[in-house]
């Protein structure tokens, strides 16, 4: 890939000038001559970089090949899976992973601003996420492909304006995201202190627009501009633009590619983002199948029923009133195959392939997938936790017991069901991260002492209820051995090693991951009437499996009618609970009073009794799993994350649990309005980041092994289990490094790249 940035354009010309040059690409010599970029009319005006830094322009535009001779590495550069970075391609793949969430959210926050001004459509791989499950799909692409309908001048103007808006998000309104970029790069040992100026100085635009030099043309594109440390590669510096820089490696990573079209039609709009329709998406993937190695895999996934998710477009047009409409004798896949072929100008070579793929997709979806999946609405399913028809009597008895216990504890539970749930959960969140003594917290929690008292009382109530025989017997009689509850939430992630910032868009969290929630979690055992008011495309529906066991202390309370909102049918899960992710899927939601569907992310988790139980259950999904959300003051100053965790009791399979020291925060604790779009998400993320910034500075590269257990074979007849020590890394010369077992080294170094680098350097 070859990149022009606007800094390369001579200010005295109205066109791109490129002298004839010679360069080597994989030992093959090419002659490159100037070609107009996609036949754009650049006579409109001088095209400058949006920061108007014309002093950086040069008269000669030089293209280099970033892949040539850069296949060596220094020790200490590893990808998210612990494998060494050995080439520029490996580096691009890592950038794609760790910046996926941030770029995705920022672009989705920016595009709605331009909905009324220019007709655009998101096409290609990003649009395919509407049709195939992006979680189980191992092809996750950071780069957006956007088709624009308009004149060449309008396209260039749009390119400039959207770049300016992206920089506004990064630089001003959402300044802390620059530090997010810096910290995640530093976590993977890609930058050092000599690079900080680029990320901390707002005058250095992180987003720039220019062109990618392809075989036959120049393609308009927006890049994220990354400055990496000088000694990243042993063979020299890499710079995929024409700029000369002898101090650092320079990467312009494409995050938005633009294409022109003269075909106008109303796009599909979901969450205020305009998308192209499926024929156009397939055609674009076919057009670039030779230059994008993952396009074939994306198309294969579109034909694999195991990757399918409910199609909201078909849903709202044909299946909303009666699911049988989807199988009417007059309805066939050919209807969709032929209807939208006019969305693009087909070539003779790909029209047949597009039609074949469409026929296979719609045929499989309509006559195989939808027969085994309830694709009407996630809320059409029935939740029923009870195993008796005489539930009213037992519910009333349980509620009376809960009321009596609560009245002896200053009615803290009832206050929680009112507006006090916000300060109570905020207290729990800040207790987890060790910030209760921060003066800013006292400003956020007005009645701090009452809130502390309520939290203590609530913790006591769970224990008291578990000791009341009448209560536990009623629970045992009323509830099934296992049942489901639901909760609509949005959680923000800080310091996640995979670059995650929000649970609704992130695609890299593994099945079997352990989630620690420091706050109380309100759930419902029915889909109550007003649940739609809490929904938006940026929310997640958590489906939580609860296993009843009255022989253990219960970490959930049936609140039911003893609540401010009695129709919620509430079950309140205790603060400090552990969950294990069992599945992630996307299911349709129908907007109230609107005939519009969209898919919402549904995360199914199992509520565990304690850390031991969570580790045991996580072992069913693999041998190496991550723990999210567990951070406290002990972790910040060094030492074990929890002294009680050192003693893991009971039989546990071979498994490594790594504490990522990721903070999970409920943003609605800091807001008076609900979260409805990605702009709301970024506003919340930044406001919370400002509060957590000192804490994140201390823990951003800290990691702990919570539990490690292996089986050692001393001889063929005897096996002996050995608990390895818990590893915590208070500094770069941690003694715990010498105790590492080779079995876990790859996973360990994934989070220890900075330390390994310093040791290498010191030698």
Swiss-Prot record:
Membrane topology recorded in Swiss-Prot or TrEMBL: Single-pass membrane protein
Q: Where are the transmembrane segments?
A: 684-700
Q: Which UniProt keywords apply?
A: Membrane, Transmembrane, Transmembrane helix
Can the keyword Heme be found in this entry's annotation? no
**Span of domain TR mART core:** 380-607
> Where does the source fall among the domains of life?
Viruses
Q: Where in the cell is it found?
A: Membrane
Q: Which GO terms describe its cellular component?
A: membrane
Predominant location: membrane
User: Sorted alphabetically, which Gene3D superfamilies does this protein's record hold?
Assistant: Toxin ADP-ribosyltransferase, Chain A, domain 1
- The entry's protein name is Uncharacterized protein R390
């Amino acid at each position: 890939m070859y990149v022009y940035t606007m800094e390369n354009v001579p200010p005295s010309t109205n066109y791109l000038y490129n002298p004839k040059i010679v360069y080597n690409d994989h030992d093959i010599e090419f002659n490159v001559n100037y070609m107009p970029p996609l036949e754009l009319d650049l006579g409109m005006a001088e095209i400058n970089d949006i920061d108007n830094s014309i002093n950086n322009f040069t008269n000669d535009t030089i293209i280099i090949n970033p892949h040539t001779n850069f296949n060596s590495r220094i020790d200490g550069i590893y990808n998210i899976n612990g494998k060494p970075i050995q080439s520029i391609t490996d580096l691009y793949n890592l950038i794609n992973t760790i910046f996926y969430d941030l770029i995705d959210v920022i672009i989705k926050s920016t595009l709605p601003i331009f909905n009324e001004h220019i007709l655009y459509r998101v096409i290609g791989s990003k649009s395919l996420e509407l049709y195939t499950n992006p979680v189980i799909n191992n092809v996750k692409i950071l780069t957006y492909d956007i088709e624009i309908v308009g004149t060449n001048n309008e396209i260039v103007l749009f390119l400039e304006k959207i770049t300016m808006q992206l920089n506004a998000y990064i630089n001003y309104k959402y300044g802390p995201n620059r530090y997010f970029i810096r910290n995640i790069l530093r976590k993977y040992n890609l930058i050092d202190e000599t690079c900080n100026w680029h990320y901390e100085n707002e005058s250095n635009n992180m987003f720039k627009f220019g062109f990618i030099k392809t075989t036959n043309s120049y393609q308009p594109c927006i890049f994220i501009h990354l400055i990496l440390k000088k000694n990243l590669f042993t063979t020299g510096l890499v710079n995929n633009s024409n700029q000369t820089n002898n101090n650092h490696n320079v990467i312009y990573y494409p995050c938005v590619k633009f294409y022109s079209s003269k075909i106008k039609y109303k796009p599909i709009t979901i969450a205020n983002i305009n998308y192209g329709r499926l024929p156009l998406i397939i055609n674009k993937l076919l057009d670039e199948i030779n230059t994008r190695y993952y396009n074939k895999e994306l198309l294969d996934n579109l034909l694999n029923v195991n990757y399918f998710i409910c199609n909201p477009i078909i849903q709202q047009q044909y299946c909303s009133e009666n699911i049988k409409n989807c199988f009417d004798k007059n309805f066939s896949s050919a209807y969709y195959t032929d209807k939208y072929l006019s969305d693009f100008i087909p070539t003779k070579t790909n029209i047949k392939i597009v039609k074949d793929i469409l026929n296979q997709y719609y045929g499989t979806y309509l006559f195989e997938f939808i027969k085994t999946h309830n694709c009407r609405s996630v809320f059409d399913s029935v939740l029923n936790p009870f195993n008796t028809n005489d539930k009213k009597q037992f519910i009333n008895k349980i509620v009376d017991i809960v009321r009596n216990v609560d009245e002896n504890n200053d009615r803290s539970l009832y206050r929680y069901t009112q507006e006090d749930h916000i300060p109570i959960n905020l207290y729990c969140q800040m207790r987890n991260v060790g910030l209760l003594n921060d003066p800013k917290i006292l400003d956020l929690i007005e009645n701090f002492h009452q809130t502390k008292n309520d939290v203590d009382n609530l913790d006591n109530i769970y224990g008291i209820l578990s000791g009341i025989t009448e209560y536990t017997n009623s629970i045992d009689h009323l509830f099934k051995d296992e049942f489901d509850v639901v909760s609509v939430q949005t959680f923000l992630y800080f310091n996640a090693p995979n670059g995650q910032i929000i649970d609704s868009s992130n695609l890299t969290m593994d099945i079997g991951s352990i989630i620690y929630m420091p706050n109380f979690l309100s759930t419902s055992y029915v889909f109550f009437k007003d649940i739609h008011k809490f929904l938006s495309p940026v929310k997640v529906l958590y489906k939580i499996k609860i296993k009843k066991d009255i022989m253990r202390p219960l970490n959930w309370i049936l609140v039911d009618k003893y609540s401010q909102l009695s129709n919620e049918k509430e079950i309140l899960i205790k603060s400090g609970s552990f969950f294990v992710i069992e599945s992630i899927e996307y299911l349709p939601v129908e907007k109230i009073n609107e005939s519009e569907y969209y898919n919402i992310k549904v995360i199914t988790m199992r509520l565990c009794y304690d850390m031991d139980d969570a580790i045991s259950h996580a072992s069913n999904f693999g041998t190496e799993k991550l723990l999210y959300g567990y951070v406290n003051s002990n972790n910040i100053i060094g030492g074990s994350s929890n002294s009680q965790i050192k003693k893991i009791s009971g039989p546990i399979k071979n498994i490594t649990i790594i504490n990522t020291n990721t903070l999970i925060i409920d943003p609605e604790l800091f807001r008076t309005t609900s979260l409805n779009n990605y702009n709301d998400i970024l506003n919340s993320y930044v406001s919370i980041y400002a509060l957590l910034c000192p804490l994140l500075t201390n823990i951003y590269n800290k990691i702990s092994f919570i539990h490690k257990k292996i089986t050692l074979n001393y001889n063929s007849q005897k096996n002996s289990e050995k608990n390895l020590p818990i590893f915590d890394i208070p500094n770069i010369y941690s003694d715990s490094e010498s105790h590492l077992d080779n079995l876990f080294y790859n996973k360990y170094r994934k989070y220890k790249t900075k330390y390994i680098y310093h040791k290498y350097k010191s030698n």
